[in-house]
């Protein structure tokens, strides 16, 4: 009996997405409005990546070339062809509105749901950001955090060799700090 319920994604319960549909229908029946958050990779984002020229490059394609990675195959299986795709389509078609936090998610939904998709950017309080660099450093420090299971999706498989090449050419001018699979809870 709430006026507004916001779902963070079709995977709003820790169940397979298609198993959340009975809970979604319950929420629709007993609450005023239900809004879907477009906050990550889902059916409509993948659809925009695979079926349109909306993005010049994405997790799934660069130009017309599909990025054939194990992670992409797994993601496509559920979020583009499987139960998560069905749940996303069902919720997006019947919810009262869709809120996207990033431009790429906004345009993915805007293509099909222009009347109920809104861009609500992530808030960043610029007054709380203080620059720590007071002078030009003698050594440039690069930090690269790598999630091994997502390195090809996030591009760290490409960025790390480039950073290493820069360091080989200029060992006295740069340093690399490389970490792997650091939990988000730290």
Language model regions located:
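Acceptor-binding helix/loop patch of EC 2.4 sugar-transfer enzymes
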Residues: 36-81
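A short helix->loop->beta-strand "cap" motif at the edges of active sites that frequently abuts
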Residues: 28-34, 95-96
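Short N-terminal targeting/anchoring amphipathic segment
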Residues: 2-20, 32-37
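Conserved donor-binding/catalytic core segment of Leloir-type glycosyltransferases
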Residues: 120-124, 128-154, 160-163
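A conserved nucleotide-sugar
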Residues: 157-185
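Short hydrophobic "strand-cap" motifs at the C-terminus of beta-strands
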Residues: 101, 144-147, 178-179
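A short, active-site helix/loop in glycosyltransferases that binds the activated sugar's phosphate group
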Residues: 46, 75-117, 161
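Short catalytic/ligand-binding loop motif for oxyanion handling, primarily in non-cytosolic enzymes
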Residues: 13-16, 42-47, 53, 106-110, ...
